[in-house]
Design a protein with these regions (language model features):
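Long, low-complexity segments enriched in small/aliphatic residues
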Residues: 108-203
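Glycine-rich, anion-gripping cofactor-binding loops and their flanking helix/strand elements
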Residues: 5-26
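Long, contiguous, secondary-structure-rich segments that constitute the structural scaffold
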Residues: 78-80, 84-132, 199-215, 219-321
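Phosphate/diphosphate-binding loops
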Residues: 20, 27-30, 35-39, 73-93, ...
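Flexible glycine/proline-rich, aromatic-decorated loop/lid segments
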Residues: 37-72, 262
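Hydrophobic alpha-helical scaffolding
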Residues: 7, 11-14, 54, 61, ...
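Short acidic (Asp/Glu) and glycine-rich catalytic loops that position anionic groups and cofactors
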Residues: 1-5, 64-73, 90
């Protein structure tokens, strides 16, 4: 692999074993990032292609509920920003694969003609109804989509849903005296995913900010001499990060829970790249760690502030460059 073209993702924040990910990026000859914010990954790119955000263009949203929702441009983009589809079209054309569209409706109509289940979900119908769930095969007003995909029976020989059992596989990472606790990465309301968007929202930053939290059981915290809201070090075989303890009876004893979106308290620095043989997903939910209290909390607080400021400065300088 010699190059990477990344759109709307931040693997230098979200992938497991971030030290290995950074090394992989350094070995690439070319890194292109197309995004709306300056992320950690964008700061490591050779070429940055800034694109418009959802409020600066129109299009169609979809989700796991099979729904299509047309959305409209709210404001004109500043500077000479292009939409994702315009950027892709120009690059493809210059690389010898001509792509010429005048608007998003032309792209959507092409998709409709390729997929019979989408064909009836026209731009006009989505604009009138606001929401359509596929299958929607007829362009007439009579076909307003399908609320229940399998209302009476499933698409199986006997009409029943099929369930399959999975064999339990032991975690690859192992607990030891040096790393006696289990880290499981989770998601919570507030800052979502890699935090690129929510981290730029002042209201959400006021609810919770760097370096994030590690939820720890009350008994474990007492044994380790850790108080609620205190800064702590979390170590694994792959690295260490600083974070804030959130002490309660909610976590299981012997386990800590961390969300992976924090920039300073990036728990994916700790997670090992042990891949599932079936899904090829890393062991995000099981990582052997050690939690240590920090005696000098004032110095620790200043360390977090300094690291946060250095990161923001680096991202700003990368954006200006």
């Amino acid at each position: 692999m010699r190059a990477a073209y990344i759109m709307g993702e931040d693997p230098l924040q979200t992938d497991a074993e971030l030290s290995a990910v950074r090394k992989a990026f350094e070995d690439l000859e070319l890194v292109i990032v197309q995004d709306i914010f300056m992320t950690k990954t964008a700061s490591a790119a050779d070429v940055i292609l800034p694109s418009t955000s959802w409020g600066e263009h129109e299009g169609v949203f979809t989700a796991a509920d099979r729904g299509f929702q047309r959305f409209f441009k709210a404001v004109e983009p500043k500077w000479d920003l292009k939409t994702d589809w315009q950027i892709i079209s120009e690059i493809a054309t210059r690389m010898g694969y001509p792509m010429h569209y005048n608007n998003t409706q032309e792209i959507w109509d092409e998709l409709r003609h390729l997929c019979p289940d989408f064909y009836g979900a026209t731009y006009e119908k989505m604009g009138e109804l606001g929401f359509i769930q596929w299958p929607c095969r007829d362009t007439s007003d009579a076909d307003q989509g399908t609320s229940y995909l399998f209302k009476e029976k499933f698409d199986t020989p006997n009409g029943l849903a099929q369930f399959f059992t999975c064999d339990w596989v032991a975690p690859i990472d192992k607990l030891t005296d040096e790393y006696p606790m289990v880290l499981s990465t989770v998601r919570e309301v507030g800052h979502y995913s890699c935090r690129s968007m929510t981290g730029n929202c002042a209201a959400l930053a006021a609810l919770a900010d760097e370096p994030g939290y590690a939820q720890i059981n009350t008994e474990d915290a007492k044994r380790l001499g850790i108080e609620d809201e205190a800064l702590v070090w979390v170590h694994s075989r792959k690295g260490k990060i600083i974070t804030r303890a959130q002490v309660s009876d909610r976590p299981n004893k012997g386990a800590i829970y961390m969300t992976y979106q924090w920039w300073i308290g990036a728990c994916n620095e700790l997670v090992t790249e042990n891949l599932s043989p079936i899904t090829k997903t890393p062991e995000y939910k099981y990582c052997a760690v050690r939690v240590e209290s920090i005696a000098d909390q004032r110095a620790a607080e200043q360390y977090v502030i300094d690291e946060y400021n250095k990161l923001k400065t680096r991202l700003r300088e990368a954006a200006l460059a």
